[in-house]
Amino acid sequence: MPDHDSTALLSRQTKRRRVDIGVKRTVGTASAFFAKARATFFSAMNPQGSEQDVEYSVVQHADGEKSNVLRKLLKRANSYEDAMMPFPGATIISQLLKNNMNKNGGTEPSFQASGLSSTGSEVHQEDICSNSSRDSPPECLSPFGRPTMSQFDVDRLCDEHLRAKRARVENIIRGMSHSPSVALRGNENEREMAPQSVSPRESYRENKRKQKLPQQQQQSFQQLVSARKEQKREERRQLKQQLEDMQKQLRQLQEKFYQVYDSTDSENDEDGDLSEDSMRSEILDARAQDSVGRSDNEMCELDPGQFIDRARALIREQEMAENKPKREGSNKERDHGPNSLQPEGKHLAETLKQELNTAMSQVVDTVVKVFSAKPSRQVPQVFPPLQIPQARFAVNGENHNFHTANQRLQCFGDVIIPNPLDTFGSVQMPSSTDQTEALPLVVRKNSSEQSASGPATGGHHQPLHQSPLSATAGFTTPSFRHPFPLPLMAYPFQSPLGAPSGSFSGKDRASPESLDLTRDTTSLRTKMSSHHLSHHPCSPAHPPSTAEGLSLSLIKSECGDLQDMSDISPYSGSAMQEGLSPNHLKKAKLMFFYTRYPSSNMLKTYFSDVKFNRCITSQLIKWFSNFREFYYIQMEKYARQAINDGVTSTEELSITRDCELYRALNMHYNKANDFEVPERFLEVAQITLREFFNAIIAGKDVDPSWKKAIYKVICKLDSEVPEIFKSPNCLQELLHE
């Protein structure tokens, strides 16, 4: 018996292990084995009826095996589902074992000690009793005389066994075919059953199974993120393309706007030019009509060459005016097409041509009339409203120097007497090879003077720049006389439109001397002389002063080629002047040979013929500042040139009257070379040159203020200015000497 019990126990444990690891159990084989064992047991106990019992049990087992299994499966199918619902996340075997422990823990001590052994024996008893419970209940007794289990316990154990097998299959199927929806439902059930926590082993198994669930969710999330990024990238590309298109359209709009704006400006400029030409032609026509009514005796003293020059100027002006509309029309056709010329522009062009032709014919007729008149007969004035200065031809005809002076003044004719037709041109600032001097002071007329000279000017606009020829209106020259009223001579450079009159349209009109002269003279006038003329009419007892005195002596002093005109005195009068003249500029240049840093008191002493004020003083100081600037520039230039030539000592540097530096300085301050430069100036120039040489050799020119030390040395080398410079007629006296 003990051997039989130990063998049965081992078979039960082996069977239980096979159930735990999922090995399929053959029901028929196990039942036959147990049936044989039971038959042997009963035959030993009851030899008489053993054979009958064995046969009966075998038959009973063979007939009822399949029916019992099907019946139990169908009977407990619903109860299995109900039992599985409360434990969705736990292992079925663990739940069954736990239930068995709770149910049998108090009645079977052997089960508490060894759960696996008890369970195995119960299952074995279940198999035995389930086959013979209906026909032979007394036979299902334990060897120890223990009564067999009730039908309910047998059914329960069988149901639990089948439920465990089915749970294994379900777990396998569930692990293989999990979906996101199933995982989501499992998570919800887990949250609902969170209070019913299980053992750590069960939790580990559950977590291990759940770690595999979010893979599909993670993949779908990554796909969603990548799709979203691709969508954003596409939107960004489209926005960038739209921005580029808008920028391109903006550039096109800007180009169109600039084209329209430029075309509008060009049309306005052309219209303005045409209107200006039309106005000028109307003015010329009016002047020509006025000239017809003049008496012939007003031009008895005029130079016939003047009319030839005027005729030539008008011819050139007509040619330029006729060519200008053609050029403008060709430009407009090239830019905007052949039909873009407006009717107004065509009308203005035609009007301009007609007016120019009319004016030209009238001028030619007038010139022919003048030359066809008898010598003793006085011819009418051609252009009295122009108020042209007559410096070229206002000299007395009996003077033997007239023709010579007139010929020598040809190069300065346009400077002293500008063409009235050139007053419409633009003013070009002349350039000179010498250092640019400060522009002379400009003094404009006040309202009282304009009203006083209004009838004489014919109601024309006052010019911005007045003539320097009026500076000598207070001086008299008995050998000259002029037929025109003095108020007309006070403003010889006036133009009807008030434009500046010092224009240069030709390349051969200005030499360096004339350019420098014009720069210093075209913007000068004297208020004192104009005021004097407006209050002192012409009378035989007091002949009016003329403009030739200043202009001719000015040219003589600047150019030095009019020695026969040296007897003309620009300071024959003693009236005070309120402005600076070119003679004052010449005087200041000569004074620079003696003093480089004059004080304001010295200037007032040596320019006694000028009524000083703040502007006059500032202008004189500015002149000397420009003189010094040119002086120092030349010194530095020749000092560096000497260093480049290899000069190493200051003893090798000297200035003589034959050196190039002296000629440059003399040409600037004494252009006519009619003044003898004092020896003291040569000494000062030599000291200055050596100072610059030493400073450059020592490397002091790196400092921006390195010249200040030289200035301090040179300012102490000023010498006394001769007393002759205090006289208003100092230039005449110096030139005579």
Curated annotation (Swiss-Prot):
Induction: Expressed in a circadian manner in the liver with a peak at ZT4.
Keyword set includes Cell wall biogenesis/degradation: no
One BP annotation, GO: neuronal stem cell population maintenance
InterPro entries: Homeo_prospero_dom (IPR023082), Homeo_prospero_dom_sf (IPR037131), Homeodomain-like_sf (IPR009057), Prospero_homeodomain (IPR039350)
Expression across tissues: Expressed in the young neurons of the subventricular region of the CNS, developing eye lens and pancreas. It is also found in the developing liver, heart and skeletal muscle. In the eye, expressed in the lens and retina at postnatal day 10. In the retina, localized to the inner nuclear layer. In the lens, localized to epithelial and fiber cells.
Biased composition (Polar residues): 103-135, 464-476
Domain Prospero stretches: 636-735
Cross-link (Glycyl lysine isopeptide (Lys-Gly) (interchain with G-Cter in SUMO2)): 324
Compositional bias segments (type: Basic and acidic residues): 320-337
Region (Disordered): 103-147, 178-221, 320-344, 444-476, 525-547
Residue ranges, annotated region (Essential for nuclear localization, interaction with RORG, repression of RORG transcriptional activator activity): 723-729
Region feature Homeo-Prospero, mapped onto this chain: 577-735
GO cellular component terms, A-Z: cytoplasm; cytosol; nucleoplasm; nucleus
Residues bearing the modification Phosphoserine: 177, 179, 199, 291, 295, 511, 514, 557
Family: Belongs to the Prospero homeodomain family.
Subunit structure, interactors included: Interacts with RORA and RORG (via AF-2 motif).
Its biological purpose: Transcription factor involved in developmental processes such as cell fate determination, gene transcriptional regulation and progenitor cell regulation in a number of organs. Plays a critical role in embryonic development and functions as a key regulatory protein in neurogenesis and the development of the heart, eye lens, liver, pancreas and the lymphatic system. Involved in the regulation of the circadian rhythm.
Domain description: The Prospero-type homeodomain and the adjacent Prospero domain act as a single structural unit, the Homeo-Prospero domain (Potential). The Prospero-type homeodomain is essential for repression of RORG transcriptional activator activity.
PANTHER family per UniProt: HOMEOBOX PROTEIN PROSPERO/PROX-1/CEH-26, PROSPERO HOMEOBOX PROTEIN 1
Protein name: Prospero homeobox protein 1
Taxonomic placement: Eukaryota, Metazoa, Chordata, Craniata, Vertebrata
Chain's gene name: Prox1
